[in-house]
Amino acid sequence: MDVIPAIDLLGGQCVRLFQGDYDQAEVYGKDPVGMALRWAEAGAQRLHLVDLDGAKEGSPVNAEAIATIAQRLSIPVQVGGGLRDRDTVARLLDSGVERAILGTVAVERPALVEALAGEFPGQIAVGIDARSGKVATRGWLEDSGLTAVALAQQMADLGACALICTDIGRDGTLQGPNLEELRAIAAAVSIPVIASGGVGSLTDLLSLLPLEAQGVSGVIVGKALYTGAVDLQEALRAIGSGRWQDVAVDDSSRLA
C-alpha cells in the first residue's frame, strides 16, 4: 500500500487544517520545495499536494511552487485545489505533475471529468471530500448534498483513474480513518481508492491493510508526519510494498 505524504499550501507555506477549517491552519514549514525533497529522500513513492488557496479562489494560486516541486522530484506528484477547467489542468500536467485531482468540478461539471479523462488517460483522479457521508465542495465550504458513494460510482464510470477519499470530520484530528466509509466506496467501484483523513498512528495505518484487497491502494498522511506521531520510514516498512507482513482479507495476519 502506498504511503503518501501530504503538503498543503496556503499563503506559500506548508500548513495543516483541522477539519477543513482555514481559520485553524497550523504552519509546519515555509519552504514547500524543501519539504517535498525531505519526504522524497525519506522514501516516499508519491507526493500529494493541495493548493488550499486555489481551492478557495477557484483557480491555482501556488502553481509556481507546485511546478518546481514536480520538476525537482523524481517521484510522481498528484495535485488538487482550484482545478476547474480544461486549460488549468493541461498546464498543470504540462508542468510535470503526474496526476490532477478534480474536486468541485466533479460535482458541478461531471462532463468535464469525462472529457479530461479521455484526453489525459490515467492522469485524472477525483477527490471525494465528505462530511458525514455527504460531499463538500469549494474548499470544503459548501455541502453538495451528494453522497460519497454515489459520486464515486459516477466518477469511476466517467473514467477517473483513482479516487482520493477524505473524511473531513477526521482531517487533522489524528483519530483514525473512517474504515466503514472507505469500505463502502471501495466496494462500489473497480478503480483504486486512496484514503485520506484521520491517520494518527502506525496502528491506524495497519488498520487499512485489510482493505487493500478490496481496492484501497494507498493512504495520504499529513499532520501525523508533521507532528512526529508517524515516522514515514516506519510507515513504509509497516504497510508499504516492501513490508514484512501481509494482512489477509479476513483480517488475520500472515507472513508475506
Swiss-Prot record:
UniProt keyword annotations, A-Z: Amino-acid biosynthesis, Cytoplasm, Histidine biosynthesis, Isomerase
Keyword Isomerase: yes
GO MF, one example: 1-(5-phosphoribosyl)-5-[(5-phosphoribosylamino)methylideneamino]imidazole-4-carboxamide isomerase activity
Enzyme Commission designation: 5.3.1.16
Main location: cytoplasm
GO CC list: cytoplasm
Localization, UniProt: Cytoplasm
Listed InterPro entries: Aldolase_TIM, His_biosynth, HisA_bact_arch, Isoase_HisA-like, Isoase_HisA-like_bact, RibuloseP-bd_barrel
Family: Belongs to the HisA/HisF family.
Entry protein name: 1-(5-phosphoribosyl)-5-[(5-phosphoribosylamino)methylideneamino] imidazole-4-carboxamide isomerase
Gene: hisA
